[in-house]
Amino acid sequence: MFNVNREYISKKRVIYNLYRRERANKMVEVKELFKNTEEYINKEVTVGGWVRSIRDSKTFGFIVLNDGTFFQPVQVVYNDKMDNFQEVSKVNIGAALIVKGILVETPNAKQPFEIQADEVFIEGESTSDYPLQKKRHTFEYLRTISHLRPRTNTFQAVFRV
């Protein structure tokens, strides 16, 4: 068999888990951002969630991110100054991301604020055939993908009642 240094692998796994736990402890829920906006405006925040929609151009892009804690998602603006701009631009709907950036007010836009991203970590990929797309889905269709129903707006609203 192969001579594997199990102690080295174990230490690496412990360090990685500590790193992830540290990031998770500093994350803010989307619900918290909407309830206490003034507390977070012009400050650095870290938010995690799933991509609801993504649009990009050559120099910047927009991600609509939802973590399931609030009915309204948060918009993330990212630009080509990020190291992984190309990777983030290719992310599909349903991918899990952790975004670190500055929360900025947007008084003339639909949403009250957005996150100007400094870093975007791709925690989990999603394929292009992910069944929940931006469009509205019928209940009949949602019955066929019962494991993903909690990620839809309709079922999130029902669960909050």
Model-derived segments and spans:
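Class II aminoacyl-tRNA synthetase catalytic cores and aaRS-like
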Residues: 17-161
